[in-house]
UniProtKB/Swiss-Prot annotation:
UniProt keyword terms in alphabetical order: ATP-binding, Ligase, Magnesium, Nucleotide-binding, Phenylpropanoid metabolism
Family: Belongs to the ATP-dependent AMP-binding enzyme family.
UniProt binding sites for (E)-4-coumaroyl-AMP: 269, 273, 339, 361-362, 366, 374, 467, 471
Domain remark from Swiss-Prot or TrEMBL: Both substrate-binding domains (SBD1 and SBD2) are involved in the substrate recognition, and are sufficient to confer the substrate specificity.
Cofactor: Mg(2+)
Protein name per UniProt: 4-coumarate--CoA ligase 2
C-alpha cells in the first residue's frame, strides 16, 4: 500500500521558505480560462475517452518497424495486458516496474496497470543493477516488464529475488520480457504470448479513487537522493487536461497529428506531455527506442510528425547537424522544448532550420505533475511568447514567486523562488513525510527550488536554480548521490560535486576531491570507480584535487565557491 501522510499528520518540518502574510501574496494565473477537469475518472478511462469515435485512427506507431496500432487495437491490447497481469496476481495498489526503452509495450503496460488500479514505476534500463535495485526496493515492486538484454542486470545484483515464472512468493520475482524474436530468458514469461492467451473480458471491475496512485516516477526533488513521487489518477488527469483539454487547449493537437516520442518515457516530460497528451487528444504517437540522428530524421519524414517534444541537446542537433537538410521536416508545426533551459542562440538557429514551426518552451518538474507553464503560442488560439520565456502558468493552477530568504511574496519582474499550487501536483514523496513537508507547505504550495520571475505579460522566466541538481541533457544528476559514493572510497577523505557548463550536455558533473592521508589516488581511478556504479549520464567528467571542501559553519558545502573555482580555470 502506498501511503503519504496528510499535511496535518506530517511532522512539523520547516517549508523551503516561510509564507508571506496572505494579504501580501501576489498570485499569477493562466491567461486562458479555467476548464472543467474530469478528475473523477481513472487515468485510462480519461485518456481513451476518444477511442470510440476514432477506432481506426492510428494511436501507437513503432517507428522503427512501421507497425501501427489503431485506437481500438491499442485499447484492446491494454485490456488484454491487464487481464494477463491480473492472472499473475497484480491487483489494486500493486507496483509494476517497467524497465524498457520507448516501445509499444511500455505504453500498453502503463495503461494496463491503470486498468487494475496498480501503480507503474518506470526505471531507466541503462542504470546499473544497484540503481535499479534501489528503486525496486523502495517501490515494493511485484513484477518487472523488461527486455531480454536487461535481465542479466536483475541477476547480477544478489539482493534481487530469484527470477521464477512458476512460483510466486516473497523470495521470487516475476519477470516478463517483450522480445518476440529470440528465446525468452530462463525463468521469464513472454509478453506477447501472455497477451495472446488473455481474455479482455476477464479484467476485473476495480473501484479506483481519484486519490489512488497511478505512477511512481523517481526524482531527486530540490536536494538529496532520488525519491518516489506519488502521482495519483487525479493529479495525472489534471496535468494532461491543463495542456490539451478545453475549447482553446494550451497544447493544441488532435486527430491527424503525429507526436514524436524520442525522449525516454521513464522521464515524466515524455510520459505526460507526449504519450498521455497525444492519446487523450486523439493524436498518434511515433515511438522511437532511442535518439539516433538519422533514424529520428527518417521517422519525422516518414510519419509526417507534426509535434516534436525535445530537450536542448536535440535542439542543438536539429539546428546544427548538416544531415537535417537532407530530410523533409516541413510537417513539423510545433517544437516543444523542456527539461532544461534553452539559450536564445539555439532558439534562433532552430527557427532558421524550421521556419514553418512554432517553437517554444515549457517549464516543469516531476513533483509538479509535471508542467507548471507552457508556451501560449501552442494554443488553438495562439498568442505570441518572448524568446527565453517558459510561457504562462497552466490553467486551473496558481503560481507565486517568493523571496528565498524571507519567504515573502514578490510582484512582477522580481526574481525569487517559483511556487505552484493546483490539482496536478504530487500527493507527496513515497514514505518520506519529512521531504514532503519540506517541499509542499501547509497551504498546498509546492516549492520548486527554481529562481524565476513573471513579467508584465504573465510570462515565466527561469534564471537560476536554488536546488543543487545537475541537469545533463535533461537528466537529473543529484550531487549528493555521487558524493556519497566518492566518500565511501577509502582513499578519499571528502568530496563535493558541482555542475560545469557544457555546450552539448548543458551541464556535466565535476568533482572536487580531498585525498585521504598518504593517498595518491588519481583522477582516472576515481572516474572509473564512479562509472562502474552509476548510469552513463552521472559519470564524472573531471576531478579536481583540493586541500579542503569549503563549507559553512553548519557544515553545508559552499557550492558557489566551487563553481567560481571552475569558472576561473
Amino acid at each position: 500500500m502506498i501511503t503519504v501522510a496528510a499535511p496535518e499528520a506530517q511532522p512539523q518540518v520547516a517549508a523551503a521558505v516561510d509564507e508571506a502574510p496572505p494579504e501580501a501574496v501576489t498570485v499569477f494565473r493562466s491567461k486562458l480560462p479555467d476548464i472543467d477537469i474530469p478528475s473523477h475518472l481513472p487515468l485510462h478511462e480519461y485518456c481513451f475517452a476518444r477511442a470510440a469515435e476514432l477506432p481506426d485512427a492510428p494511436c501507437l506507431i513503432a517507428a522503427a518497424t512501421g507497425r501501427t496500432y489503431t485506437f481500438a487495437e491499442t485499447r484492446l491490447l491494454c485490456r488484454r495486458a491487464a487481464a494477463a497481469l491480473h492472472r499473475l496476481g497484480v491487483g489494486h495498489g500493486d507496483r509494476v516496474m517497467v524497465l524498457l526503452q520507448n516501445c509499444v509495450e511500455f505504453a500498453v503496460a502503463f495503461f494496463a496497470a491503470s486498468f487494475l488500479g496498480a501503480v507503474t514505476t518506470a526505471a531507466n534500463p541503462f542504470c546499473t543493477p544497484q540503481e535499479i535495485h534501489k528503486q525496486f526496493k523502495a517501490s515494493g515492486v511485484k513484477l518487472i516488464l523488461t527486455q531480454s538484454v536487461y535481465v542479466d542486470k536483475l541477476r547480477q545484483h544478489e539482493a534481487f529475488p530469484r527470477i521464477d515464472a512458476c512460483t510466486v512468493g516473497d523470495d521470487t520475482l516475476t519477470v516478463i520480457t517483450i522480445d518476440d524474436d529470440e528465446a525468452t530468458p530462463e525463468g521469464c514469461l513472454p509478453f506477447w504470448d501472455l497477451i495472446a492467451d488473455a481474455d479482455e473480458g476477464s479484467v476485473p471491475e476495480v473501484a479506483i479513487s481519484p486519490d489512488d496512485p497511478v505512477a511512481l516516477p523517481f526524482s531527486s526533488g530540490t536536494t538529496g537522493l532520488p525519491k518516489g513521487v506519488v502521482l495519483t489518477h487525479r493529479s495525472v488527469v489534471s496535468g494532461v487536461a491543463q495542456q490539451v483539454d478545453g475549447e482553446n487547449p494550451n497544447l493544441h493537437m488532435g486527430a491527424g497529428d503525429v507526436a514524436l516520442c524520442v525522449l525516454p518515457l521513464f522521464h515524466i516530460f515524455s510520459l505526460n506531455s507526449v504519450l498521455l497528451c497525444a492519446v487523450r487528444a486523439g493524436a498518434a504517437v511515433a515511438l522511437m527506442p532511442r535518439f539516433e540522428m538519422g533514424a529520428m530524421l527518417g521517422a519525422i519524414e516518414r510519419w509526417r510528425v507534426t509535434v516534436a517534444a525535445v530537450v536542448p541537446p536535440l535542439v542543438l542537433a536539429l539546428a546544427k547537424n548538416p544531415f537535417v537538410e537532407r530530410h523533409d521536416l516541413s510537417s513539423i508545426r510545433i517544437v516543444l522544448s523542456g527539461a532544461a533551459p534553452l539559450g536564445k542562440e539555439l532558439e534562433d538557429a532552430l527557427r532558421a532550420r524550421l521556419p514553418q514551426a512554432i517553437f517554444g518552451q515549457g517549464y516543469g518538474m516531476t513533483e509538479a505533475g509535471p508542467v507548471l507553464s507552457m508556451c501560449p503560442a501552442f494554443a488553438k488560439e495562439p498568442t505570441p511568447a518572448k524568446s527565453g520565456s517558459c510561457g504562462t502558468v497552466v490553467r486551473n493552477a496558481e503560481l507565486k514567486v517568493v523571496d528565498p530568504d524571507t519567504g515573502f511574496s514578490l510582484g512582477r519582474n522580481l526574481p525569487g523562488e517559483i511556487c505552484i499550487r493546483g490539482p496536478q501536483i504530487m500527493k507527496g514523496y513515497l514514505n518520506d513525510p519529512e521531504a514532503t513537508a519540506a517541499t509542499i507547505d501547509v497551504e498546498g504550495w509546492l516549492h520548486t527550488g527554481d529562481i524565476g520571475y513573471v513579467d508584465d505579460d504573465d510570462e515565466v522566466f527561469i534564471v537560476d536554480r536554488v536546488k543543487e541538481l545537475i541537469k545533463f541533457k535533461g537528466f537529473q544528476v543529484p550531487p549528493a548521490e555521487l558524493e556519497s559514493l566518492l566518500i565511501a572510497h577509502p582513499s578519499i577523505a571528502d568530496a563535493a560535486v558541482v555542475p560545469q557548463k557544457d555546450d552539448v550536455a548543458g551541464e556535466v558533473p565535476v568533482a572536487f576531491v580531498v585525498r585521504a592521508a598518504d593517498s595518491d589516488i588519481t583522477e582516472e581511478s576515481i572516474k572509473e570507480f564512479i562509472s562502474k556504479q552509476v548510469v552513463f549520464y552521472k559519470r564524472l567528467h573531471k576531478v579536481h584535487f583540493i586541500h579542503a571542501i569549503p563549507k559553512s559553519a553548519s557544515g553545508k558545502i559552499l557550492r558557489r565557491e566551487l563553481r567560481a573555482k571552475l569558472a576561473a580555470c
